[in-house]
Amino acid sequence: MELGLSLGDAVTVADGGRLELVLGLGVGVGAGVRRGEEEERGRREDVVGAGRWAAMAAASPEPSVRLSLVSSLGLHWPSETGRSEAAARGFDVNRAPSVAAGAPGMEDDEEGPGAAPALSSSPNDSGGSFPLDLSGQGLRGHAEAAAQGGGGGGGGERSSSRASDDDEGASARKKLRLSKEQSAFLEESFKEHSTLNPKQKVALAKQLNLRPRQVEVWFQNRRARTKLKQTEVDCEYLKRCCETLTEENRRLHKELAELRALKTARPFYMHLPATTLSMCPSCERVASNPATASTSAPAAATSPAAAPTAAARTAVASPEPHRPSSFAALFAAPLGFPLTAAQPRPPPPASNCL
């Protein structure tokens, strides 16, 4: 015996008179049928199967056993034009099943289009089929339906949020517009009092024809602007101080580096040993005779007329003893020219030594 596996094909007789058993696996996917129609269809299949087995038993000498695994549920396969294509490509879950009659022998027994099984099932029907759609179109349809349902809810939420945003934008656009007189009066009031108590707030609002809340908000904004400006001024001042300190610190670091370099460098001069002061002989004479040097200076400063007189007096007062000699006797005769006074001796030159 030969076993052939096929999906949805009818039972065929192989060459040589042998029976080719066909394993029919039917999966009903889609809408179910009612219980009564299923029972009637099952009875018809049993009758047709019995007739076929009798014919095959008469034609075949060997005993044959029929294995039928066809479910009692309705087999909804494509029509005759698409039967060969379905048999060739097998079971396609992406293709929507048809609602026509499934059995090839039962097409003639159908009573007409009005006798098509109703696409409904009851929860109490134990033999009814369950609706299950695995096709891509069905999945896409469910996804689109869910998206439309969610989009409807989300659209409502978006519309409500957009409406609230519009309301907020309208309230934001409705800013307080003050006239020049009102602004000037509020500025003067702020200079006098940066904060207001409730009584002052009500009085000022009544005077300016405003609400107390508007006056309070204006004062809050004015205090915030004043604080911001003061903060900016302080920030600029601190920035300048920081820059000055940075420059001073850089200068001090530079001086410190120079001092360290001088400390570690080798000195350019050698320390000379201690020595004694030496004086030249002329300086020593000047230092030993201070009185002589002091008296000789006024004598040199006198007039030239008084100098011969003083020299003559000195020569007369202290005459030196004269010892005659043979050579002097030869020239004992008096000289014919008068004796002149001795020229004063110039003072010694000053010494250059220290």
Curated annotation (Swiss-Prot):
Signal peptide: none annotated. InterPro entries: HD, HD-ZIP_Homeobox_LZ_Class_II, Homeobox_CS, Homeodomain-like_sf, Leu_zip_homeo. GO terms for molecular function: DNA-binding transcription factor activity, RNA polymerase II-specific; sequence-specific DNA binding. Keywords: DNA-binding, Homeobox, Nucleus, Transcription, Transcription regulation. Residues 171-230 bind DNA. It is found in: Nucleus. The keyword Signal does not apply. Gene3D superfamilies: Homeodomain-like. Residues 229-273 are annotated as: Leucine-zipper. Expressed in seedlings, roots, stems, leaf sheaths and blades and panicles. Residues 98-175, 294-323 are annotated as: Disordered. GO terms for cellular component: nucleus. Residues 148-157 have a biased composition (Gly residues). Its main location: nucleus. It holds the Pfam family HALZ. PANTHER family: HOMEOBOX-LEUCINE ZIPPER PROTEIN HAT14, HOMEOBOX-LEUCINE ZIPPER PROTEIN HOX27. Probable transcription factor. Belongs to the HD-ZIP homeobox family. Class II subfamily. This is Homeobox-leucine zipper protein HOX27. It comes from Oryza sativa subsp. japonica. The lineage of its organism: Eukaryota, Viridiplantae, Streptophyta, Embryophyta, Tracheophyta.
